């Protein structure tokens, strides 16, 4: 009897999993646009640079609680994010030029 109950328990778990999967499929998925994602990435790059600039200004003015290593870390993060943004832009321009050179 215990083997049958064990199998019934497994079957009920599988049925519950299948029902939850169907429920998740029926929910409308939010639309994510390429332009929206690109705009959000540019905003994050801008925010990173703003934070670095603000930290550098605070350190220059001698405000307490702002350490040089934090300023340098923020400046490096801003630099790396800007370089990444430039590389993404270069790849997008190259892809656009390749598409435009295709013959229809």
From Swiss-Prot:
S-S bridge residues: none
Gene Ontology molecular function, alphabetical: cytoskeletal motor activity; structural molecule activity
Transmembrane helix found in the keyword field: no
UniProt-listed InterPro entries: FliE
GO cellular component, one term: bacterial-type flagellum basal body
Coiled-coil annotated residue ranges, if any: none
Main subcellular location of this protein, as a coarse class: other
GO process terms (BP): bacterial-type flagellum-dependent cell motility
Subcellular location as annotated: Bacterial flagellum basal body
Keyword annotations from UniProtKB, A to Z: Bacterial flagellum
Protein family (similarity comment): Belongs to the FliE family.
PANTHER family for this protein: FLAGELLAR HOOK-BASAL BODY COMPLEX PROTEIN FLIE, PTHR34653
Descriptive protein name: Flagellar hook-basal body complex protein FliE
